[in-house]
Amino acid sequence: MNIRGAPDLGQPSDDPNSGGERERIRQRMKMVIGQLEGILRELKEVAKELREVVSQIDKLTSDFDFELEPDDWTTATVSSTSSSDKAGAGGPFDLGHLDFMTADILSDSWEFCSFLDVSTPSDSVDGPEAPRPGTGPDYQLMNGGLPIPNGPRVETPDSSSEEAFSAGPAKGQVPQRTPGTRERVRFSDKVLYHALCCDDEEGDGEEVEEEEAGLAPELPRVEPHTGPLKPSPAPYKTKRSPLTTRRLGPTLAPEQTRRVTRNSSTQTVSDKSTQTVLPYTATKQKAKGKN
């Protein structure tokens, strides 16, 4: 059926079925409206509770004095009244007239700008002025340097030098150093060599050759006891690789073994492991004992 009650030609007319569907739709709409009304009532109750909480907060904080300095950058500087008084005056968002160009607010910024003008060099035609004693701030350098007026224009000592780790000089002694110069590193060549080069076999070979050359004139003094015709082996040991000299370490003289197996804190781990005399005799004795 259509709106006027006439039967619809396209659909068969069922009066009881169509009336039941309308009733069901009306009931659902009433149920939804009732739920919405209940939600509105609950929201009104929540609003009342919030108003009571706000009034209690106002009563508790009425004894507090919230007046702040005028140069504080907060919205609380406008007024120290409660939220209810603000709502009655001009709405909850009425902050009044904020004048940010007052002298009290800009006092700190102008002082900072004047400090920058004093600390920076002038851009005059005559050139930068010489630093006057007592006027510019003294900047303490970071690597143990001395207080130098008007910024770090003198280079600091190198962090690897001994000057950076040594104690500061006396108050009366001020080192005269020109800009651009650096302190010479006081590390010895041997320490610097072992720190930069982990493979120091060439230096060991030269030291062993120097030791053999130094001990060469002492060997003929011992030779007359063995025989006059036996040639001295000193000239044949002058040219020898570092590996062979290390393998023949147990057969060297006690003075040579002391010099070869020197104890130095600057040697690398590989250098010490190759220069120490390994206990080959102990393993041979164990093998003989087992046989």
From Swiss-Prot:
Membrane-crossing residue ranges in chain numbering: none
A GO cellular component entry from the record: postsynaptic density
Presence of keyword tRNA-binding: no
Subcellular location: Postsynaptic density
Alphabetical GO biological process terms: chemical synaptic transmission, postsynaptic; inhibitory postsynaptic potential; postsynaptic specialization organization
Record text on subunit structure and interactions: Interacts with GPHN.
The protein's name: Inhibitory synaptic factor 1
Originating species: Rattus norvegicus
Gene name of the encoded protein: Insyn1
